[in-house]
Amino acid sequence: MSKCDVKQNALCKSLGPEYKIMYIDLERCIYRDFGNGFDVEISGTHTTSNRKTATVYLWYVPEKITVKRVSGVKQSESGKVVDELYQFSQKLLRKGITDRDTLWSIRRTASS
C-alpha cells in the first residue's frame, strides 16, 4: 500500500463509517451515499500532502448530474463541507427540486 493510500484511508476513516474509498473516473476518491438520491465525491485526497486541497462534488444520482462543486477545500474541512452539502440536498428535496433542468440551472450558479 502506498503512502498516498495510507493517508487517504486515514482521512476516510476519520470522516466516519458512512464513507468509503471508490474509484470514480479513474481517480481514487472518498465517497458517501446520502441515501436520499444524492451522494458526494471528495476528489484530490489521494496525496501525501496536507496542504493540497480537495474538490467536493454533490451528485444527484437518478439524473447522473453534478449539482454543486466546492473547490479549494482543506482536507481537514472536508467533513464540514459534506455536512453542508447534505443539508443543501435535503433542502432541494423539501422543495421538490429533482428535475434535470432545475438541477442543471442550480449547478451553473452554485459551483464555487
Model-based region annotation:
Residues 34-66:
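Acidic, low-complexity, intrinsically disordered interaction modules
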